Amino acid sequence: MKMTSKKMKDELMKRLSRPEWDFQYDSEKEVLRIEQKDSKKGINVSLPGVVAKWEVNKEKAIEEVAYYVQEALIAMHKEENNAAKILPVIRSTSFPKQAEEGNPFIMTDHTAETRIYYALDSNKTYRLIDERLLQKLGLTEQQVREMALFNARSLGYEFKQDTVAGNTFYFLNTNDGYDATRILNESLLQSMREKISGDMVVAVPHQDVLIIADIVNEIGYDIIAQMTMKFFAEGHVPITSLSFVYEDGDFEPIFILAKNRKKTDGKEKG
């Protein structure tokens, strides 16, 4: 049998066939690329070189190349999984519950307005964990939740501060994709609670901001309502336009129509 690049391509594709790998063939350059579907990382195999080895070693040449490609791709996949972190992300309760029909996301209830999803983060991008990915990772839902909350507590935070009409507003906006996630860090919330003299109000209008406010008067409630609405409208991944009073570990949504109010005591001046 005369071996050609095309025949070698077919032989390698047969031996390296896996549901998680893709093949691309450049007939001009006689190169076969085998890559991971999810990360697009892969190996290029120059077929004329393999054919030349086959002329000398026959079957052994094909086995060696197939083994090399397989081991390299498996090593790449392990490296990615080791580098990946699982982190929680906050989403609106209106966010889809399934990746596709019959494949629900892993979720946890949070507040009346928000829900917790879980992301597999590989630094450059992240993917929300659904049941199929959960099985692929070989983890249970409980393990995912525990790992995610542990990693959330390791996220750093540094607030910017602004005071208006006696009310103090603290803003966290690192743009790491997990600013709203910091709302799940109980020790962070407790440390803020200790420094706040009025009502502690918390808002996550979109993914890339966490607002904590020390509200001491009615004007402060108007400001936080307007502020949250503005951030919600501008956010790349909006979550909720409502803010929450935080007390004893619970979040109570505030239903306020933001408007300028004038308090009167019924007395005329003049």
Curated annotation (Swiss-Prot):
It comes from the Bacteria. Signal peptide: none annotated. Pfam families: DUF1444 (PF07285). HAMAP family: UPF0354. Belongs to the UPF0354 family. This is UPF0354 protein BCE_4835.
